Amino acid sequence: MELFSAEAETLRKIVSEWTEHPERELESCFGPKGQVDATRFLTVAQRLKAKGYTALPQEDRLTITTLDNTRFTLVGMGLIQQYCRDNRLAGKPFIAMIKDRAGVESNLDLDDYETRIKVRREVPLAADDARVKDILSTWAQQKKAFRLIRRWTFQGKGVIFDLSIVRSTKKDLRGNYVWVRNFLDQDIISSAPIYEIEVELIRGADTDTPEKALSSFIKGIGEVLRGLQKHTLLMRKSTSIRVLDAYKDFVGDDKFRGVAPVTLELKNMMKDQQPGVPNLRTGYNVTDKADGLRVLGFCDGNGELFMIDMALNIYR
């Protein structure tokens, strides 16, 4: 992964501060607005599994966020169903915390890779904390945002990969939640799911120095990006756009210039050949079908070779 000097310096600073503040969480998310499509989501999951990362079992969870950024989490489908019926949190086992931005540089956007690195402060709250009791005492009147999460987690060296399918409270055009008081005030269950992929840096022997933490974090981000780009050699978005523009100028079109496949019929294989009908018995070499990606080789003005597939995706 290639970073500009300013990006690399900011990332080093963020990671260094993370090692000094145990209450901070450092993670990266991928795709426009932190979302990817279902196809790329599955591709990344398959890659992580094939690479031998350890799968960690996860239960479904429901997170409930209030206006003051206090987050409550219920774990387990039985507990979630019970809450959806009565909208009561008191008397149920929950996890409470305050999660907000931390540090001078709380976000770092790597636009060329559609990746955002986020620093957040997590403050756990006990069930008997005065702030929790105050919220629970007016729970029915509290405005809330819900996120129903089904998650698959893989553990690597110093990082964990969270792949989540999320159904949540609706958002307005500015990306802010349309707050509700009860889970059933919106049809969250039937809403279209969104797909999220996150890489989180975890504390341990593999991340106990800034250098080791930075190495683990970059490696984890690179694994996800290789799955998203479907190639081992990562490439900047700006490079892909530049190469595609050069290809369009060269061919004078925005289409894949390879020969289109044709479905073979019996007449294309008969011994008695018909005039004007292509026949495999003359001028063709028949081989077993080779599965793979069909690409064109394209050399840009700098002499660098790229591959372009039928969907006009660019590979180095």
Where does each model-flagged region fall?
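Phosphate-end processing signature that detects enzymes handling 5′-triphosphorylated RNA
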Residues: 1-255
